[in-house]
Amino acid sequence: GNDEYIIYWATTIRGRFPETQIEADNGYNHRMYYVTTKDFKTFSETELFYEPGFNVIDATVVRDSGRWVMFLKDETREPAQKNIKIACADQLKGPYSAAGEPITGDYWAEGPTATKIDGEWTVYFDKYIDHRYGAVASKDLISWHEVSHHLRMPEGIRHGTVFRISKQELQRLIN
């Protein structure tokens, strides 16, 4: 078919975005970049995917009612952010809006993955300093509340991704 896939990642390109460059965190000053491919053998040139004006990592993008929602980590060290924020776009490749206010609480969070079930969003993430998983929920992507206390996760779990599988696939995984 005509399916085109987008592969995106965070990296630092030395000398780019000097206004947010610091020596802490190994001098990392990440932005989100992407390539496209139809066959996973040939790839487009690398393009800038998201430049929020701060060090950004761990983006995950999901479709929502005709728009694209990016959950991302603000990796700013000084003053510390280390939280999850949201940006939106009409097209997958952007341009994305400025990142909103943090949706996570007074702890360091990264590696978000999002679900929308029965009209409610849940964003799961790694509370990596606390060595545990966390979650927040929202009906509108604006007002968020903590639901971390409801989680029961395997010990040692780190960044994860939620995706849909069939009952048959589940049975094969369990057995």
Task: Outline where the language-model segments fall.
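Carbohydrate-active catalytic/glycan-binding domains of CAZyme proteins
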Residues: 1-175
